């Protein structure tokens, strides 16, 4: 299965957001790190900041709404947005995920990331 996902450039992720501070950690598979253009040894906190800092500013609210909707519902939520790749390209991303845990300390989301502008 991993070979199939890697072959079609689908990156998997798990995000942990501290419910008190709002700080996030982005845990990724190898394909996701490749899509983000980051090294394998990046920390989850650095990875989250990297992803967040390269979001297109005009679409930040759409992504924030997706995160809020995932936290509030028990359904899978999807959003498409431009993302500024470190190699200089702006790519269109389809992100799909769901909330898998929420308590007083942490909110956990899981999902996938796919660059769709390369079709």
Predicted features by range, described:
Residues 90, 95-118:
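Short loop/turn elements at sensory-signaling interfaces that couple input to output
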Residues 14-17, 85, 115:
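Residue-level signal for short segments within beta-strands and strand-turn junctions
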Residues 46, 76-78, 95:
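Short coil/loop residues immediately preceding or within conserved phosphate-binding loops
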Residues 19, 26, 77, 82-88, 90-91, 101, ...:
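PAS-family sensory domains
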Residues 1-50:
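PAS-family sensory domain signal
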Residues 11-14, 65, 76-83:
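PAS and PAS-like sensory modules
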Residues 39-42, 51-62, 68-75:
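PAS/GAF/H-NOX family sensory domains and closely associated sensor/linker modules
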């Amino acid at each position: 299965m991993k070979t199939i996902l890697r072959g079609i450039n689908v990156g998997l992720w798990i995000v942990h957001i501290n419910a008190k501070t709002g700080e996030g950690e982005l845990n990724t598979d190898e394909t996701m790190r490749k899509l983000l253009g980051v090294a394998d040894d990046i920390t989850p906190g650095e990875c989250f900041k990297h992803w967040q800092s390269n979001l297109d500013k005009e679409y930040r609210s759409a992504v924030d709404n997706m995160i809020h909707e995932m936290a509030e519902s028990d359904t899978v939520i999807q959003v498409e947005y431009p993302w500024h790749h470190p190699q200089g390209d702006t790519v269109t991303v389809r992100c799909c995920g769901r909330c898998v845990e929420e308590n007083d300390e942490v909110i956990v989301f899981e999902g996938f990331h796919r660059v769709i502008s390369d079709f």
